[in-house]
């Protein structure tokens, strides 16, 4: 039940329009043509080539070993089959360390078929987001738990609690002002994610950030209940058990996001 015509490809301006219209956005990760084709045909609005592939595809303990070449390879595979969903690709660890490196990596990803790049964090990344946007490269920001910062954070932990909540809101305003088209909020308490969503004009896409975000994203392996070799986060729901097939699971997930039934309190974090 989407107000965006099923046959109409998503564009960057359409994402902002969706927020203005109160239309929830549905996002999933994909790393190959087969899953991407199924997601595209069953109601997914955005597909993310996540550097999560380092953990769920390559078997690493973090996303840090993923390279730009890895991202380009998977982006090409997915881009070949998409008809409707907008394709976002991560800038992997280190690729956004300087504006020049970020531009080079972004150009490679856009030439491979991505329509937007995702950058983790704020701070000096705000200037890099602005640098890319000024060069006509759409950017998705990523705040809260940023997996590329796992060494500094000491693990995969909830972010934005206590005094950190105010900083998260300020960071969200900063990346939006720099020109980010959308932003992912990961592992953030529901009230804080709701405050961020109300504070910015760009859509927020939650993953473990509660139901009041403007959309939701899950990792392919998590939403299908596949064993990725890592502890399953609280916010994950197995939609394959409900949907009975990958296509059915995709439709069930898309419907649950759009009608607001996912995520519920069981799949979110309190303050």
From Swiss-Prot:
Its cofactor is Mg(2+). Pathway: Cofactor biosynthesis; (R)-pantothenate biosynthesis; (R)-pantoate from 3-methyl-2-oxobutanoate: step 1/2. The keyword Metal-binding applies. The active site is at residue 186. One of its GO terms (cellular component) is cytoplasm. Pfam families: Pantoate_transf. Its EC number is 2.1.2.11. Its main location: cytoplasm. Keywords: Cytoplasm, Magnesium, Metal-binding, Pantothenate biosynthesis, Transferase. GO terms for molecular function: 3-methyl-2-oxobutanoate hydroxymethyltransferase activity; magnesium ion binding. It comes from the Bacteria. It is an enzyme of class 2 (transferase). 3-methyl-2-oxobutanoate binds at residues 51-52, 90, 118. Binds 1 Mg(2+) ion per subunit. GO terms for biological process: pantothenate biosynthetic process. Mg(2+) binds at residues 51, 90, 120. InterPro entries: Pantoate_hydroxy_MeTrfase, Pyrv/PenolPyrv_kinase-like_dom, Pyrv_kinase-like_dom_sf. It catalyses: 3-methyl-2-oxobutanoate + (6R)-5,10-methylene-5,6,7,8-tetrahydrofolate + H2O = 2-dehydropantoate + (6S)-5,6,7,8-tetrahydrofolate. It is found in: Cytoplasm. PANTHER family: 3-METHYL-2-OXOBUTANOATE HYDROXYMETHYLTRANSFERASE. Catalyzes the reversible reaction in which hydroxymethyl group from 5,10-methylenetetrahydrofolate is transferred onto alpha-ketoisovalerate to form ketopantoate. Belongs to the PanB family. Homodecamer; pentamer of dimers. This is 3-methyl-2-oxobutanoate hydroxymethyltransferase. It comes from Stenotrophomonas maltophilia (strain R551-3).
